[in-house]
């Protein structure tokens, strides 16, 4: 049977080792957070629209609806870029007509050996209407959709396809977003045919 003194003799080095490990971890965390690099780093794109914590439920709903809409367009990009149509998680952000139309249009493009590469920019998204009291809360959004850097290319050769020179590549789009049990979903996306 060990005495209290012999137990302390074994515990003290372990305690000191744990303290040294904790101190080293803290020092590493502090130095890694305070990098001296002047190069700004791009923030990662959110993989899912996370609910916003806010004291004002109206402002939180607006932020969540906009975040969902922006994530929706990132998934649309993925869907159009993947000829198999399997890499996108569009159902996390879209439903109803919006989901049906995007899936149908992407399939049509893929069936014709076309993919879209590049980026869609959702500019100045704003909530223009909000109804949180209905059975299914709903928001109406307006934004400037810029598809000028979203190129249609041959899926095999990656060569750009010629498109009409007078097509709108930056236009106003009106969208409806509903809050479902699993989160906000884009249910309708309607280009307004106006430049922005």
Describe the role of every protein-language-model region.
Residues 3-21:
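Bacterial N-terminal signal peptides that target proteins for export
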Residues 29-32:
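C-terminal motif of bacterial Sec signal peptides marking the signal peptidase cleavage site
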Residues 34-37:
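Bacterial signal peptide processing site
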Residues 42-43, 62, 140-141:
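Charge-rich, low-complexity terminal tails
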Residues 42-54:
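Extracellular mucin-like PTS domains
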Residues 52-120:
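Core segments of small alpha/beta cavity-forming domains
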Residues 92-196:
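Structured, amphipathic secondary-structure segments that form assembly/contact surfaces
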């Amino acid at each position: 049977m060990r005495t209290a003194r012999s137990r302390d003799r074994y515990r003290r080095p372990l305690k000191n080792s744990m303290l040294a490990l904790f101190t080293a971890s803290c020092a590493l965390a502090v130095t890694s957070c305070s990098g001296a690099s002047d190069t700004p780093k791009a923030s990662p794109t959110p993989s899912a629209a996370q609910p916003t914590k806010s004291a004002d439920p109206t402002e939180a709903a607006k932020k969540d609806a906009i975040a969902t809409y922006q994530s929706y367009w990132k998934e649309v990009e993925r869907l159009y870029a993947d000829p198999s149509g399997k890499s996108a998680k569009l159902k996390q952000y879209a439903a109803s007509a919006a989901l049906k139309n995007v899936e149908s249009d992407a399939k049509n493009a893929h069936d014709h050996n076309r993919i879209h590469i590049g980026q869609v920019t959702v500019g100045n998204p704003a909530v223009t209407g909000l109804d949180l009291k209905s059975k299914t809360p709903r928001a109406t959004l307006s934004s400037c959709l810029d598809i000028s850097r979203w190129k249609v290319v041959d899926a095999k050769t990656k060569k750009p396809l010629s498109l009409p020179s007078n097509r709108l590549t930056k236009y106003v789009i009106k969208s409806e977003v509903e809050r479902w049990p699993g989160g906000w979903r884009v249910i309708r996306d309607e280009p307004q045919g106006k430049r922005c």
